[in-house]
Curated annotation (Swiss-Prot):
HAMAP family: CobQ. Residues 253-439 form the GATase cobBQ-type domain. This is Cobyric acid synthase. The gene is cobQ. The lineage of its organism: Bacteria, Pseudomonadati, Pseudomonadota, Alphaproteobacteria, Hyphomicrobiales. One of its GO terms (biological process) is cobalamin biosynthetic process. Belongs to the CobB/CobQ family. CobQ subfamily. The active site is at C335, H431. Pathway: Cofactor biosynthesis; adenosylcobalamin biosynthesis. Pfam families: CbiA (PF01656), GATase_3 (PF07685). CDD domains: GATase1_CobQ (cd01750). It comes from Agrobacterium fabrum (strain C58 / ATCC 33970). The keyword Hydrolase does not apply.
Length: 485
């Protein structure tokens, strides 16, 4: 088979492209179509492991889940993982090919288009419909040369485009009409419809606005999509999701402090905890202190462990964490957070930056050496308390000193992670720990709460079903299928 194609681009970042594709993937799948998601280029430190040992953006993993299809590196052939303000690791078809500064990457892009189109053609043979997500803003004409993410891809793949604007942030008419004005005619001709997303209030009050947009752009209106409140219950890919206020839960019995460091990665590890009614996550930014009543300090993964460790120390959070342990609190480090808890972190080959060896927090008797080889694998095993676990590993670096120590878990016969002698500090390389209902329940009990009866996977699927129904009600899905080609 050769699939029909439909691409969704946005007037800016975080206008709802990822969830639009996820919801439509579930909606069209429920109509009996086979659907696969595709994003030519993604920038995110939240990644998922594919069955063939590669990695793709977490948004594409959620979209694949919505469509009921296994993950493939071809769903996100170019993944950029920021390592600094100006540079990123470049992952092509699931494998690291190097790192590049922003200016250098602009020259790399022309050579990446053949790989992008190769992945796209591969997916077209597997489904009835390919739903493509653009990146950032369609109107970034300064980046149009060698573009592989938006109009450059749409033109190369002959993919009709639906443009999404976010009315919740204001100025949606200007952003949609303005996009039409700055695009050249050939690019603008690829856009065949528009969606106004995240509307609040009486839709009748914006009927004139929808008409004006259509008149000024000559695009079809696909619909005015009301705000979907349950969107917060789905995994967020971008760190933008961490920049807003946290969900307050005054009656929560368990408070967990999460340092928000500049290169935090795989922070979707927090989502299952956030869904628990008895858990309140406290985001602690540099310059803030860890509340004394928190039961657990959770150090998430990091794309730049040494740099984030320096920020943590400069902010005095290392002192806070050690005081938390002295008060009898728990600390759990995941992946990069685990590395920070050890005695030293060494980067002799300059994997993350200039070669260096730095002192860790010294709360675990381990040392880490960062290496060029990356471990990407889904895992199953048993944790130290005999509870089963499933998750995935995604890291560079080898951590030694585990022999003779209490190990966190046993994975396929080998030891993972370690525990301090007093049983208060834990470190593991396993991501997805709290998405495992067994592990999450055990940790809630350890922290003084009750085990959970919440089925996280079922909750996510239920939200995807509601999102699909929301789109069926408010968008013209038949028109979308007619536009797809």
């Amino acid at each position: 088979m050769t699939a029909r194609v439909l691409m969704f681009q946005g007037t800016g970042s975080d206008v709802g492209k990822s969830l639009m594709v996820a919801g439509l993937a579930r909606a069209f799948t429920r109509r009996g179509l086979s659907v696969v998601p595709f994003k030519p280029q993604n920038m995110s430190n939240n990644a998922a492991v594919t069955a063939d040992g590669g990695e793709i953006g977490r948004a594409q993993a959620l979209q694949a889940r919505a469509a009921g299809v296994p993950l493939s590196v071809h769903m996100n052939p170019v993944l950029l993982k920021p390592q600094s303000e100006t540079g990123a690791q470049v992952v092509v078809q699931g494998k690291i090919v190097g790192s590049a500064k922003a200016a250098d990457y602009q020259h790399m892009k022309a050579g990446l288009m053949p790989r992008v189109l190769d992945s796209f053609e591969h997916l077209k043979q597997l489904a009835d419909l390919v739903l493509v997500e653009g990146a950032g803003s369609a109107s970034e004409i300064n980046l149009r040369a060698n573009d592989i993410a938006n109009m450059g891809f749409a033109r190369a793949a002959d993919a009709p485009v639906i443009l999404i604007g976010d009315i919740d942030r204001g100025g949606v008419i200007a952003s949609l009409v303005g996009t039409r004005e700055v695009l050249d005619d050939d690019d603008a001709a690829m856009i065949e419809g528009f969606i106004v997303n995240r509307f609040r209030g009486d839709p009748a009050l914006f009927s004139d606005g929808m008409r004006m947009i259509a008149e000024k752009t000559d695009w079809s209106s696909i619909g005015l999509l009301p705000h979907f409140s349950d969107a917060a219950k789905l995994p967020a890919e971008d760190a933008l999701g961490l920049s807003g206020p946290a969900q307050r839960k005054p009656s929560a019995k368990i408070r967990i402090a999460v340092p928000i460091l500049p290169h935090i990665s795989n922070f979707d590890d927090l989502d299952p905890l956030d869904m628990e009614p008895d858990v309140e996550l406290i985001r602690v930014r540099p310059g803030e202190t860890i509340p004394a009543d928190c039961r657990l300090v959770l150090l998430c993964g990091s794309k730049s462990t040494i740099a984030d460790l320096a920020v943590l120390k400069d902010a005095g959070l290392d002192i806070d964490i050690k005081a938390h342990v002295r008060r009898g609190g728990y600390v759990l480090g995941l992946c990069g957070g685990y590395q920070m808890l050890g005695k030293t972190v060494a980067d002799p080959d300059g994997i993350e930056g200039p070669p260096a060896t730095v002192e860790g927090l010294g709360l675990l008797d381990v040392d880490t050496v960062l290496t060029g080889d990356k471990r990407l694998v889904s895992v199953r095993g048993t944790s130290f308390d005999g509870v089963g676990l499933s998750g995935y590993e995604m890291h560079v670096g080898e951590t030694t000193g585990i022999a003779g120590s209490l190990v966190f878990s046993t994975i396929d016969g080998h030891a993972d992670g370690t525990i301090s002698p007093d049983g208060r500090v834990f470190g593991t390389y396993i991501h997805g720990l709290f998405a495992d209902d067994r592990q999450r329940s055990a940790w809630l009990e350890r922290l003084g709460g009750q085990g959970t009866d919440l089925n996280y996977d079922a909750q996510v699927d239920a939200v995807l079903d509601r999102l699909a129904a929301h789109m069926e009600q408010h968008l013209d899905l038949d028109r979308l299928l007619a536009i797809a080609r």
